[in-house]
């Protein structure tokens, strides 16, 4: 089974004449079929870690590998979805999805067929000819997911993809993401600062603090697998264990915040 790993990653940059560490000797990994969610406050280094996994940034030390092969730069085995969807506003939904396939050299008929297939997967088949400006926030994020899925990556890297959505749309997108995960068997790497989102979407949850980024806690979570096995969202979120873990994580964040304030 394909596995994406970050090994002993460190990154720093110059600030006012001094080196400031963002990541220091950080290691983690996930396999296809897993959902690794990184939970942490803003500014702790989560997005930097995702950018390194995606190949957008190069670490000062350490390496990113898939199955022992060191990666340099972006690649088709990793699809990326951002909070800012970065869609091409002058293209319609279908052409936004097909663009990445065109860059990879697929012929027009093949890329159009593939684009329509993934639009159907995310429930946008009826909006293929719509311009991006005519789509709602939730539809734009669905389109961002479709574009990432079109190139058939092994791993989806998602940087707070639902953070700008209203609460109801956000919950619907979380359910859609788990449906896609169940159907495709992709590995998910998602970063968030929402405790509820992390608990619902993760098979493995990493709590991060920083900078420099450090892993405070790692814990296996089974709510995503329970949803994939057919349990309802209402049943999962009303489970006392969900509430217990939610409160424990919130308490942990409060402890960290109070410790920082004391200093």
Curated annotation (Swiss-Prot):
The answer to whether keyword Cell inner membrane applies is yes
Report the InterPro entries cross-referenced here. Answer: AAA+_ATPase (IPR003593), ABC_transporter-like_ATP-bd (IPR003439), ABC_transporter-like_CS (IPR017871), ABC_transporter_ATP-bind (IPR050166), P-loop_NTPase (IPR027417)
Q: How does it sit in the membrane?
A: Peripheral membrane protein
Q: Which GO terms describe its cellular component?
A: plasma membrane
Q: Which CDD domains match?
A: ABC_NrtD_SsuB_transporters (cd03293)
Disulfide partners: none
Q: Name one GO molecular function term.
A: ATP hydrolysis activity
Concerning SUPFAM superfamilies, the annotation shows: P-loop containing nucleoside triphosphate hydrolases
Subcellular location, in the record's words?
Cell inner membrane
Q: What is its EC number?
A: 7.6.2.7
Q: In terms of one coarse class, where is the protein primarily found? A: membrane
**So what does this thing catalyse?**
taurine(out) + ATP + H2O = taurine(in) + ADP + phosphate + H(+)
Which Pfam families does this UniProt record tie to the protein? ABC_tran
Keywords assigned: ATP-binding, Cell inner membrane, Cell membrane, Membrane, Nucleotide-binding, Translocase, Transport
Keyword Transport attributed: yes
**Sequence ranges assigned to domain ABC transporter in this UniProt record:** 4-235
Where, by residue number, does ATP bind? Answer: 40-47
Q: What function is annotated for this protein?
A: Part of the ABC transporter complex TauABC involved in taurine import. Responsible for energy coupling to the transport system.
Oligomer status and interactors: The complex is composed of two ATP-binding proteins (TauB), two transmembrane proteins (TauC) and a solute-binding protein (TauA).
Q: Member of which family?
A: Belongs to the ABC transporter superfamily. Taurine importer (TC 3.A.1.17.1) family.
Q: What name has this protein been given in UniProt?
A: Taurine import ATP-binding protein TauB
